[in-house]
Curated annotation (Swiss-Prot):
Record's protein name: Protein-glutamate methylesterase/protein-glutamine glutaminase
Keyword Chloroplast in record: no
Domain observations: Contains a C-terminal catalytic domain, and an N-terminal region which modulates catalytic activity.
Compartments in which it is found: Cytoplasm
Enzyme Commission number(s): 3.1.1.61, 3.5.1.44
Primary location: cytoplasm
Species the sequence originates in: Thiobacillus denitrificans (strain ATCC 25259 / T1)
Length: 356
């Protein structure tokens, strides 16, 4: 059975290019195209698509307004098509909160040739979306307890020496938000790699910073890693943990993609294994593929403690599944339980926080 795709975009050019890309794939087909959400509503009823691609900025009805109604009334996998503007990236973050599975950026230059170069990327995103676990959205759909912040870390030594190292991909923006919102202001320092293109990581970090008790920023490289702070890999670089004297520091590296990704979760996890050893706790969240599994195993070998998100709470159970398969994890738990388990581990092992 081919994946049935409905394209919603006000640009005839983009609709044509997307149709060409999707119909060129052996395992998917376009069952309808709509210039606006009003037309899309009828086509959804008629064609019953498996995946919807949705332009974030459209006339007649705002793409976000349409997405919110869709997720409430007929939840389905949606891939947003977004412009590379600051406004576009902010709207995209909101769309992911509302339940879109993923997004793909519109290329800047000559749109048609640029889009055709995106063929593999777009096709991959649609394949992943078709397999994604879509949950009806309620105001607190995902977060179990994301509204509650956990109690402060009891052992001050713990929070200054221990680190939380997080990797995620598809579905990860919401999972990371739900995880970080539970952390207390004196939580150990956090380093995060989320697969996301340049231009979107800053909007994501700014959004998290407004929502969380800890401070969240896009890593610039050279920052001292502090308790109560989270550092997000920028879309153009790998993020690494390094040491300078007694301090943990961030480092950016624009080396080639690893596992087809830059930033790569494996790069971050490998650096944590090397630099922090048993002071690091690794957390692998929802995402497609195997990025992070090998690095998480290195963290385990170096004495770190690792947790994976369970299948039921993942949008895509790929990266956690691979990490579990190679024997890299110590615990597997639902998303809403992971922050508590991490902090409980630190509380129980605080006296062992040691410089390496």
């Amino acid at each position: 059975m081919k994946i049935k795709v409905l394209i919603v975009d006000d640009s005839a050019l983009i609709r044509g290019v997307m149709r060409e890309i999707i119909n060129s794939q052996p395992d998917m087909e376009v069952v309808g195209v709509a210039p606006d959400p009003i037309a899309a509503r009828e086509l959804i009823k008629q064609t019953n698509p498996d995946v919807l691609t949705l332009d974030v900025e459209m006339p007649k009805m705002d793409g976000l307004e349409f997405l919110e109604k869709l997720m409430r009334l007929r939840p389905m996998p949606v891939v947003m098509v977004s412009s590379l503007t600051e406004r576009g990236s902010e709207i995209t973050m909101r769309a992911l909160e509302l339940g879109a599975v993923d997004f793909v950026t519109k290329p800047k230059m000559s749109i048609q040739s640029g889009m055709l170069e995106y063929t593999d990327l777009i096709a991959d995103k649609i394949r992943i979306a078709a397999r994604a676990r879509i949950k009806p959205r309620t105001p607190h759909a995902q977060g179990g307890q994301s509204g509650t912040t956990l109690a402060a870390v009891r052992n001050p030594l713990t929070s200054s020496e221990k680190l939380i190292i997080i990797g995620a991909s598809t579905g990860g923006t919401e999972a990371i938000k739900d995880f970080l919102m539970q952390l207390p202001p004196d939580s150990p320092g956090v380093l995060i790699t989320q697969h996301m293109p340049e231009g979107f990581t800053r909007s994501f970090a700014n959004r998290l910073d407004k929502l969380c008790k800890i401070s969240v920023k896009e890593a610039e490289g050279g920052e001292r890693v502090l308790p109560g702070h989270a550092y997000l890999a920028p879309g153009h670089s790998h993020l690494l943990l390094v040491r300078s004297g007694a301090n943990y520091m961030t480092k950016l590296d624009q080396g080639p993609p690893v596992n087809r990704h830059r930033p790569s979760v494996d790069v971050l996890f490998n650096s944590a294994a090397l630099t922090a050893g048993k002071n690091a706790v690794g957390v692998i969240l929802t995402g497609m593929g195997k990025d992070g599994a090998a690095g998480m195993l290195e963290m385990k070998k170096a004495g770190g403690y690792n947790l994976a998100q369970d299948e039921a709470s993942c949008v895509v159970f790929g990266m956690p599944k691979e990490a579990i398969a190679v024997g890299a994890t110590h615990e597997v738990a639902p998303l809403h339980e992971l922050p508590r388990r991490v902090l409980e581990f630190f509380a129980a092992h605080g006296e062992r926080a040691m410089r390496v």
